[in-house]
């Protein structure tokens, strides 16, 4: 192999390793068997969610995972592998891909990493069932507001009882 090719591959490994380090979440899938239309729809959905999706050679992924400190992730790089990277939203790649697997049997989640920790297929699927950040914040807000709301209703009920008795 020529030195130019080796240098180019080393550069690719470095680039992918940096993406792995910076990613909030990584989802590795086997997209073998997807039609062109399905692949296009999947890529569009991921792009709209701010997720980068690439098909990368396993040898490059393995070396990049080692450099990024995700050695355990090497086990999922068997057969054709495509990787979804998200830098902001931890849930987005898992949710989009998991939703897509319901309509496209050919797409299979192999595993991934969540905030630097290697995760199994089951953990990625569990992550996909969670609401996004805004949904979680609204749930938290409603939980925090509930006691205040209950006190307000109690005070109002007491006031109405006193008015009715007078």
UniProtKB/Swiss-Prot annotation:
InterPro entries: Ribosomal_uL10 (IPR001790), Ribosomal_uL10-like_sf (IPR043141), Ribosomal_uL10_bac (IPR022973), Ribosomal_uL10_bac_type (IPR047865), Ribosomal_uL10_CS_bac (IPR002363)
GO BP annotations listed: translation
GO molecular function per UniProt: large ribosomal subunit rRNA binding; structural constituent of ribosome
Annotated disulfide bonds: none
A GO-annotated cellular component: large ribosomal subunit
A Pfam family annotated for this UniProt entry: Ribosomal_L10
Superkingdom assignment: Bacteria
Keyword Ribonucleoprotein: yes
Keyword annotations: Ribonucleoprotein, Ribosomal protein, RNA-binding, rRNA-binding
Assigned protein family: Belongs to the universal ribosomal protein uL10 family.
Subunit structure: Part of the ribosomal stalk of the 50S ribosomal subunit. The N-terminus interacts with L11 and the large rRNA to form the base of the stalk. The C-terminus forms an elongated spine to which L12 dimers bind in a sequential fashion forming a multimeric L10(L12)X complex.
Function (record text): Forms part of the ribosomal stalk, playing a central role in the interaction of the ribosome with GTP-bound translation factors.
Protein name from the UniProt record: Large ribosomal subunit protein uL10
Species name: Streptococcus pyogenes serotype M6 (strain ATCC BAA-946 / MGAS10394)
